[in-house]
Structure formats: C-alpha cells, structure tokens
Amino acid sequence: MYKRQLSNFAGGVLILIFKPFKVGDYIVVGNYEGTVRTIELLYTKLTTVDNKVVMLPNGTLSNSNIINVGAEDYRRLDIEMSIGYSSDLKLAKTLLNNIINANPAIIKDREIKVIVKSLDESCVTLETRAWVKTEDYWDTKFTLLENYKSEFDKNGIEIPFNQMDVHIIQ
C-alpha cells in the first residue's frame, strides 16, 4: 500500500513539475478521457463528457501515454464516410467538399481534404480532413456528420451497412 502511495506521490510531483496538462485541458489516458478538473499530489480528477468524475492515480498517469487534446488552439477533424461501390464517387467527394467549405467553424486557410481512404469489401471509405478550433471540435463533427448523411440521402449516395443473408435449408 505504501509503495502505491509513494508512486502516486512521485507521479504527482512529476506532473506538477513537467506540466503535461493543466486544469481545463481535455486529455485521453488509456480507456479514460475527459476534462482535467483538479491536479492533486496523489490523484488527478477528470470529468468525462457524460459528467462522470474519474479519479486517476498520479502514479498511473505518470507512467502512461497522455494525449493532451486541449493543448493546442486548433485540432484536425477527420471524419470517415463509406459509400457503396455503385455510388458516384466524384459526386460524393464534391458534396463532402461543399459541406466542409460551407461550415463557418472550418478554418479555411488550413488544408481541407476529401480523400479515398480505402477500398473495402463492401464499400469505398472516404475521409474528410479539416481544421477547427479545439473548442469547436465536437459541435462541428456532429453537424458535419448530420449534413453528410442528409446530402448523401438527397443525392442518392448509398451508405452501406452490414447485412446478413439467411438461407433456410430443409
């Protein structure tokens, strides 16, 4: 027990000295992510997006990979969309590009891309890449996803989903 407390104390000292994050930053550590609420000597408290409080031992934190999402003012927003092989690829890319460029939260002087990410078994996976202010990330992502779906529906672009054919043998 003392070994664990000493590890948490040492981790707390390291966090306070090296400052890999600060109160208010949004971090990802292992299976946990949230906004840093307090940094104490033994524990760091996060609040998750669904308002749960997570107490992470500083010993664990100091020995983990920490992704500090809130450290920078801007964040790249990557969204994957799949279309059917029979859908018009050029039209789908044009629609995605138009939607991104029409969104006021997108930083227009940074690179905006619509690419074919992969050719999969049952679909063509496209990806959009654009930059937003970190605080606009989630709202912009949700808005873009809804707009992508709506425009694909209006223009007959199929979004495939997994299907299972069941054959009954008598």
What is the predicted function of each stretch?
Residues V69, S87, I107-Q170:
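Solvent-exposed, non-transmembrane regulatory segments of membrane-associated proteins
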